[in-house]
Each structure stands twice: as C-alpha cells, then as structure tokens.
Amino acid sequence: MGEGGLDFKFLPAGGQFHLRGSDEALTAYGGLVAWDHFLERCGVFAQLAGDYPLPRTSPNATPVIDILKAFSLNCLVGGTRFAHCRRLQDDTAVAKITGLHKARLCGEDAFRRLCGSLDAAQVEAWFAPAEQMIHHAMPPNAVADWDSTVVVRYGKQEDAAIGYNPQKPGRPSHHPLACVIGGTRLCLHMEWRKSNTVSASGWIEAMEKVWRSPLAQHRIRLNRGDIGFGQEPIMAWHEQGKGKRPSYLFKLKLTANVKKAIAAVPWDDWQGKSNEGLVQWVELKLKLHGWSSERRVIVERTLKPLNPSPQGSFWKQCEEDFSAYVTDLTTEEADAFQVVQLYRQRADAENVFAELKNQWGFAGFCSQKAAGSGSSARMLLLVYHLWSLFVRVLKNQGSHTEAIKSRDELWFIPAKLVLSDRRKIIKLAVGGKLASFLEEAYQRLEEWLSRTSPQLSLSMDKRPPWLLFAPTQATQASVTSPTLRLLSSLQLRILG
C-alpha cells in the first residue's frame, strides 16, 4: 500500500503518531527464509510435485510446487480454511523468498482444483513416498500408538457420513485413523475414513501398509491402543506372525463376562495395599466369547471414596474403579505393574490430534470432493512433520515444541527485504535474547545442512540420504548412508 493510500493520526500514551502505508517489502514472517532453505535442501515438495499423478497440459497452469508451497504457508500462519491464504497473497516478500513463478501466491481454489480430479487411491499413492520419510525417524524398539478422531463437517462433502460424533450428534463427519510413534509426536501413517466406522475399522489393512516397510518391521516392537482395538481379528493378526510381528497391548472393554471374571478373583490375589486411593492389580488368563485362544489380561483396581466431599461421607464407603488390559507380552518381558505403566504412556499420542486440530487446522480444511479433503489432511500432516523436525534441529532439544509456541519463536519475526546490488538481504527486527537465540539456532541449521546431502529421494524402494534421527541399533542395510550415522545424537534426543 502506497503512502498516499493510508494516512492517519493516533494519540497513544507515547504521544501523537502518524500511521502511513509503505511500498517496501515488509513481512511478518521473517522465519520463512530459514524454513524455505530447509525445504529446498530436503527436496520433499519438489519430489512431491514431480510425482503428481495427472498430466498438466495448460501452459498457464500454476506449477504444482507453487500450489504445495502456498498451502503449506497457509498452514504455518495459522490458516484453517483454504480462503485464509488471502492474507499472504499481497505479501511480496513471501513470494520473492519462496521463488514463486508468478511472483504471487496462488488463490484459494488452486489446491482444491489440483486434487479434485484424483481418486482416493491416487491420493494415497501420491503421498505414500513422503510418508515413508517419517519411517526413518522411528527409534529402535518403537511403540506404535493407534488412535482415531472425529472431524465434524458442515455442508455437503463426499465421504462425510453420520456416525459416532460426541460433540455434534447426528452431524456428518470424517473419522481418520492414525498411527503415532510413541514419544515422538510423529505420525507414521494415516487412513482417511468415513465417520460410519469404529476405531478398529480397516486397522488390519492400515497395519499391513505400515508393515510393508522394512524399517517398520525392524523397529516396531509393540502396537498399543484403547478399547476400540482390543478385538479378536486385531489380536489374532499379531499372534499369527509366529514371533515376527510386534506384540500388542490394548485396553479391554469391561463386558459382562470380564466383570464376572473380575468378581471371581479372591481378595487375597490382588497385589498392592487395599487402602483408599491406591492402585491394586491382578493377572488373569481369560478366553472370552469369540476369542480364538486364552490371553493374558491385567486388571487394575482403584478404591475411590463414594462421596469425596470436604465434609466426608456418612458411611465411609468406597467404590471400586476397574480397568482391564489385554496383551501378549510375557511375564518375562513385563510384569503386571509394568504393563499398566506402559499403557498409560500412550496418553501423549492423543496430544497429536489435539495439536493438529487446534493449532494446524486439521479439522478445518475441507472440500466438497473427498479427494480434496483427504489431500489437504495428508498435506497438512506432512507440513506438521517437516515443521516439527525443523524445530528440533534449530532448538536442539529432546522434547516436542507445539506450533503455538514454536511459530512465535521461529516464524513470526518482523522482517524487511532489501535489494542491494545483486544481493537479497532480509533484515529481521530482533534484538537482545531473541537475536542470540536465532543466531544459535541458524548456526545449528547451517551446520546440519552442511553435513547433509542436498538431494532427497522419496521413492518407495530407496532410503532418503538425509536422516534426522539415525538408529543406534540398525541392520547393516540401514546404515549405508553417511548422514545416517553422523546424526545419531539427534535420534537419541527425540526420546527425551
């Protein structure tokens, strides 16, 4: 906006100020320079654009990579709708930094049109190589946490169906299923499903897709899930592998037969003190109706006050709170108490969906066509992964930093683009502690990129030559890349 188009006077506490527009290349997203440099060296978007399954014959068509970049930028600035990309379209600095061919971000319909002609199989095959990249972030002896969520839809969208929806009963929704690597906040696989399904619907097919990866077969040691996954077909899938498939740990629904078995347990068999507020547990061998074999079941019991009020209860009675878990882990691998503790660690997996829906717009991007909604969900998940890995490199920390904080630290930085001779200079409006923090972060990024191959192959049969988290215990075939060995320290910090 030119100076003549905006001219106001305001009188804040600091005195009178003149507010005027400027034609200079100013942006609120100074962190974009380091981010786009990271993407260019990784080559993920370039490979994804090259693998687009349909031919594009129009000479005026926006390049696929520009469309992918525009969608990713919309996600990073907090957009939750396709239309929210408009806030970036007039930012000339963003267009110049990202090298867009038309010197301007594409419109809100570009991504929908790009994916609208695809079917579900093409969408999944298109994003599958990028998903394989996350397989290399798995630590040894990884735990795969399976969970699902409800994405409410408004209006009419393909594949949106009426099903389980506790927030908006009777309203159509989608019901995606995800596999999260325990302790990493990274999603190994996602199935985009209708809502007229349960948590376990299509689990075996999804697990088979994950299990086709040699890395998954080598590193996943346990599948973990809540009540919805403790079903005979899923447990039988693990047991049919004859020791070559991962173990399982699922929460068991307290059916009438399970309650009957718990009621038959003698009081003396419960381990632990029977004081109010303390946990007791017992181990059972059960073969419930529909089960093909007898299985190990651990029952947890907590004595809770019936009337937990400040005045106390009149009769001093307690009620019993039960939870049951079914697993094929042996007593040598984990005792009853350790099984319960191991299950409780899966709570962090639910934070992935919470962050995606509340901070990344996972529940917002939708299209009338199913391919548009599914593609936006997969693309958003890819951006989430890349940003998480980017933040880990810059901050050099073990714990995950959610987007609501990391964007303020590394993305929303006021900046000015200056063209000096043949050089393009970005001046960041930072000082003090923030300047020192960014200097250290960018030095770590430069050091990491200097040791990393600039190419990234995402084909199904080839490993990417760069890895953020190298396994400390891997097969000989998985350590052929030189960068896979030199980054082992980052792999250790991912579990912090």
Regions found by a protein language model. Name each.
Residues 2-13, 17, 246-358, 443-496:
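An anionic, glycine-rich sequence signature occurring as long contiguous blocks
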Residues 363-427:
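Basic, amphipathic alpha-helical segments enriched in Lys/Arg and hydrophobic/aromatic residues
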Residues 1-171, 176-197, 201-216, 415-496:
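Dynamic "connector" segments at or just before major functional cores
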Residues 155, 231-237, 259-263:
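A short acidic (Asp/Glu
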Residues 26, 57-66, 315-316, 367-377:
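Structural motif
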Residues 220-230:
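Acidic/histidine-rich, metal-coordinating catalytic segments
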Residues 38, 85, 333-379, 383-390:
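Short amphipathic alpha-helical "interface-anchor" segments enriched in bulky aromatics
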Residues 215, 235-246:
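Short, surface-exposed basic-aromatic patches at helix termini and helix-loop junctions that form
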